[in-house]
A protein has these predicted regions:
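Sec/Tat signal peptide C-region and signal peptidase I cleavage site
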Residues: 19-24
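Bacterial N-terminal signal peptides
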Residues: 10-17
Length: 355
């Protein structure tokens, strides 16, 4: 898919008058991109890697972006600071990792009980979401773009079964973003741990449960070996990663390279979304055949209802923290109301009638 898309994009660039012959002797812009992910953490690491490849090919080598994985720069949760400070021209991470520094950036990854991936992409590109995200990052002098979606994530791996709200009290769990605040309200001790430390933290009992992503990435991390209960999701229905770009460096690029970079980011983001979907489909069947001891569970209805209540209360509180987050949450709520009616009529009804 990526090779075919690259050819189409290059052809489009030529039609637009970006002749590669004219590129030959132009200045080469060498950039660096820092990621939250390790060098083998597919498909997350694939999004920036493919983006850099596309940008280089479409620019005939004029935009050369080196991708540094977390095992090189050693600051997996410091991506915003490094891009903002100019150590890196670009970054690839998840916006909710720095909600403690700037609450306005929180909603752009995903929100509990929120939009699905198609709904959220429609909001970003046609419902005003992208403009709101740029508005949130403007104070950091950073541009932000969708960077690939994991789809609906699983609810996490637990050492013990959750049968009631009492089972959540005192539970130590790694879960980032707004979902962590929801669980904290219900008595969970919440922490955020970098990806490379997740397995050892669960193995040593530093945490009792963790949420990572979905079957393909979770199985590769080996969580099924130490926590047998695997819960369906509620908290991250459309986890969108983010490309971050230093605004000053972006403005220094010629206009054609700016357009090439934006296009490369958009294509790589979509490619990660469908790549991850494929990987999860393969991994799900593998769990059923190779790991029969994994127990697939759904949280009890009374627990889900308590989470929804806590989520609604927290949203009201967050909306009071800044005019911008109030605007973003209002935009998401209004778009979801409109989009969900079509989702129910199209996707849900189709599945209901044909499963």
């Amino acid at each position: 898919m990526l090779k075919t898309t690259t050819k189409l994009l290059v052809a489009s660039a030529l039609v637009a008058g970006l002749s590669t012959a004219a590129f030959a002797k132009d200045k080469v812009y060498k950039w660096k991109l820092a990621t939250t992910w390790g060098s083998t953490l597919s498909p997350f690491i694939d999004a920036p890697t493919n983006m850099a490849k596309l940008a280089k090919e479409m620019s005939n080598g004029r935009l050369d972006i080196r991708v540094d994985a977390a095992n090189k720069h050693k600051a997996p949760l410091g991506i915003l600071d490094m891009v903002k400070g100019g150590q890196y021209e670009m970054g690839h991470s998840a916006s909710y990792y720095w909600k403690g520094k700037d609450i306005n950036t929180l909603p752009f990854t995903t929100m509990p009980f929120g939009m699905t991936a198609p709904e959220q992409y429609a909001w970003f590109y046609y419902g005003g979401g992208l403009e709101l995200m740029q508005k949130a990052y403007k104070r950091h002098k950073v541009l932000s773009f969708p960077g690939g979606n994991s789809g609906n994530q699983m609810g996490g791996w637990f050492r013990k079964e959750i049968n009631s709200l009492d089972d959540l009290k005192g539970l130590k769990m790694r879960i980032p973003g707004f979902a962590g605040e929801v669980l904290a309200k219900l008595g969970v001790t919440v922490t955020n741990i970098a990806p490379g430390e997740l397995y050892t933290s669960l193995e040593r009992g530093t945490i009792d449960a963790l949420e990572w992503v979905s079957p393909s990435m979770d199985v590769n991390m080996g969580f099924h070996k130490i926590a047998p209960y695997y819960y369906t999701g509620w908290h991250e229905p459309a986890t969108e990663l983010q490309f971050l770009v230093n605004e000053r460096q972006f403005k220094r690029l010629p206009k054609d390279l700016q357009k090439i970079l934006i296009t490369a980011m958009r294509v790589a983001a979509y490619d990660m979304y469908i790549q991850n979907y494929h990987m999860n489909a393969v991994a799900w069947s593998k769990i059923a055949t190779d790991y029969p001891n994994v127990k697939i569970k759904t949280l009890p209805k009374n627990v889900i209802n308590a989470m929804k209540k806590a989520n609604d209360e927290l949203l009201v509180e967050k909306a009071k923290e800044s005019p911008l987050i109030k605007e973003v949450l209002k935009s998401q709520k209004e778009y979801l109301k409109k989009a969900r009616e079509w989702t129910k009529m199209a996707d849900y009804k189709y599945l209901e009638d044909n499963l």
